[in-house]
């Protein structure tokens, strides 16, 4: 599906906007602080329930307003879907799909698979393991119907287990939690391992095109020792876990490591090369989803020109066009994106929260 229409009310510095969008490329051009990134963030929030620059709802609601409102119209090959999200300063959300309330944020995420590329997105490569777990979990969410429920239950059980660690004195007292936790942990780890294996060749091929000067390898680490039963790990680690008051091993400690010529990419690649790698990984993940499910991603790219020379920008643009996906690109100058434009694209000018085409 593509987003054919977007309505924004009281989001960041945007009071009201009603945008008719292209199913191909949509360009948002304006000076720093004009609101072009806010449009990208509104789209992201409509599909995730949260902004990518702030986790606090009050910070994205326009000054002196009580809530933001986002509406979108998704155009598929056979049907149209109307979606909406309202969130107030307390963080309470209301999700509407096809005119009915009571829906979940996860339903929006399923309807709008999207890939985000921002100047801050280097955390996928040089940040903590949670960012790379999120990369894998995005793929598992869109490829395994039961993943989100299992993942939510895992988070709940880990929170309960960690609280119990402050109160128990013997491992037997933890068994009720571990009886539920162990099969969930093993299932989630299996899904992650299968997904990382399935997408590995796609990532390798795309990364080779973007960074042919490096030999890149990918490895999934599940969060506890190889060839070791998770039940044994939990029992053996009880005293240490009790001292730490948290569960030290498990899928919540998993990682997905990327190396260039045998060394961690964050120690080897320049900022420009890291951005290319990030773009390659996001593209590979989106293309894998399309091939496996027939569904296309939305791509959100903030500050397109940063860190990339003309040749690399051209390569990224050509690969994005080849996906036949809907793409939203922000840039300071139209000169940076004019070569990507065609008869089907739309160019929006953003100035002080006002958007014109």
Swiss-Prot record:
Lineage: superkingdom: Bacteria
UniProt entry tagged with the keyword Cell cycle: no
Record's subcellular location: Cytoplasm
InterPro entries, sorted: DNA-binding_RecF (IPR001238), DNA-binding_RecF_CS (IPR018078), P-loop_NTPase (IPR027417), RecF/RecN/SMC_N (IPR003395), RecF_2 (IPR042174)
Binding-site list for ATP: 30-37
Family annotation (PROSITE patterns): RECF_1 (PS00617), RECF_2 (PS00618)
TM region(s), chain numbering: none
NCBIfam families in the cross-refs: recf
Function (record text): The RecF protein is involved in DNA metabolism; it is required for DNA replication and normal SOS inducibility. RecF binds preferentially to single-stranded, linear DNA. It also seems to bind ATP.
Stated name of the protein: DNA replication and repair protein RecF
Organism for this UniProt entry: Salmonella typhi
